[in-house]
C-alpha cells in the first residue's frame, strides 16, 4: 500500500511510501526531528531522494 499525494506520510521512512513515482515525503523539520509530513511531488530540479524504483 502506498500513500496518496497530499496525505500524511512517515518522515522517517524512505520516499517509496508515496504513490507517485516522483513523489517524496515532504516534512518540516530541524535537528533530525520531522513533523507535518505529507507526500509531495518532486521534479528533477529538486534534490530530494525521489523514489525511482516504482
UniProtKB/Swiss-Prot annotation:
GO terms for cellular component: extracellular region. One of its GO terms (molecular function) is toxin activity. It is found in: Secreted. InterPro entries: Omega-agatoxin_II/III_CS (IPR005853), Toxin_34 (IPR013605). Keywords: Calcium channel impairing toxin, Disulfide bond, Ion channel impairing toxin, Knottin, Neurotoxin, Secreted, Toxin, Voltage-gated calcium channel impairing toxin. Disulfide bonds join 2-19, 9-25, 16-51, 18-39, 27-37. The keyword Disulfide bond applies. The keyword Secreted applies. Signal peptide: none annotated. Expressed by the venom gland. The presence of a 'disulfide through disulfide knot' structurally defines this protein as a knottin. Omega-agatoxins are antagonists of voltage-gated calcium channels (Cav). Causes rapid general flaccid paralysis followed by death in 10-30 minutes when injected in mice at dose levels of 5 ug per mouse. Belongs to the neurotoxin 04 (omega-agtx) family. 03 (type II/III omega-agtx) subfamily. This is U1-ctenitoxin-Pr1a. The lineage of its organism: Eukaryota, Metazoa, Ecdysozoa, Arthropoda, Chelicerata.
Amino acid at each position: 500500500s502506498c500513500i496518496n499525494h497530499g496525505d500524511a506520510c512517515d518522515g522517517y521512512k524512505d520516499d517509496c511510501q508515496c504513490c507517485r513515482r516522483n513523489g517524496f515525503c515532504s516534512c518540516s523539520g530541524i535537528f533530525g526531528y520531522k513533523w507535518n509530513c505529507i507526500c509531495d511531488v518532486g521534479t528533477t530540479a529538486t534534490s530530494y531522494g525521489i523514489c525511482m524504483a516504482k
